[in-house]
Regions:
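Early-domain small/polar-rich strand-loop-helix modules and first-structured segments
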Residues: 1-88, 145, 153-165, 198-207
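Phosphate/ATP-binding catalytic cores across multiple sugar-kinase/actin-like superfamilies
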Residues: 104-116, 163-170
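Phosphate/oxyanion-binding active-site loops and adjacent basic polyanion-contact surfaces
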Residues: 75, 96-106, 136, 214
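Single conserved hydrophobic/aromatic residue that forms the stacking wall/gate
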Residues: 212-220
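Short glycine-rich phosphate-binding loop at a beta-alpha junction
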Residues: 120-130
Length: 220
């Protein structure tokens, strides 16, 4: 499904609070992250859906959060957790599986790059989550059809693998030595450290992760 030989990729960084969407084509130097507001550098999209009562129209992200303050809207958050728990959500006389609503949210954010003039179809969708489990990998591949793609177009990775790809696609001088990355989520800071073992052939790359909270530092 290449576009004149220029492969087109969409990436979604996902946790239970927000999503971030980026796109990349081979004529670009690096991926570009998109916002729901043109010209804004606020890239975190709240993982929230809202539905107007009796009409059935869905809103997502910041707009859903804002409109949910009205008594006319029903708001659903924690979609990732609810989907993994196979929750059923009842709104008025309608019932939805949380996995179905998570897929609806993902479809909406997947459309953001096309609003910037990019193709509406893409070659690969990469979803990045905190950790890979049998349950979340199975769920995402199971919802591929709902997302309008086939399973061969989908890749699910965790943050360690994402960090690995990011680091080794930088200038070589940046990863000749150890590479570290800090990531903040609410009151916690994640510390990732990438190391290369130069004594082995081929070289072995290892990534360690520490979680720093207000109380202690532990491995997540």
């Amino acid at each position: 499904m290449g576009h004149n030989g220029n492969s087109y990729y969409i990436g979604i960084d996902l946790n239970d609070s927000y999503a971030m969407v980026s796109f990349f084509q081979q004529n670009m130097k690096e991926p570009e992250t998109v916002s729901t507001v043109a010209g804004s550098e606020e890239f975190q999209i709240p993982l929230v859906l809202a539905r107007r009562k009796s009409i059935g129209k869905w809103y997502y992200g910041d707009e859903a959060r804002r409109l949910s303050k009205s008594g006319e809207m029903v708001c659903i958050d924690q979609l990732l957790k609810r989907a993994l728990n196979s929750e059923k959500i009842v709104i008025d006389d309608d019932s939805f599986m949380a996995e179905e609503l998570l897929a609806l949210f993902l479809k909406k954010v997947m459309e953001l790059p096309s609003k910037l003039g990019n193709p509406s179809s893409f070659d690969r969708l990469v979803i990045c989550v905190d950790r890979l489990t049998k349950e979340n990998v199975s769920m995402f591949y199971g919802m591929a059809v709902r997302l309008g793609i086939n399973s061969r177009q989908l890749t699910v990775i965790d943050r360690k693998e994402s960090f690995y790809y990011f680091a080794l696609n930088q200038d070589k001088s940046l990863w000749l030595h150890d590479v570290v990355m800090f990531m903040q989520e609410k009151e916690s800071i994640f510390f990732y450290s990438l190391k290369r073992d130069l004594r082995t052939t081929p070289q072995v790359v290892s990534i360690d992760c520490l979680l720093y909270t207000s109380d202690a530092a532990d491995e997540p």
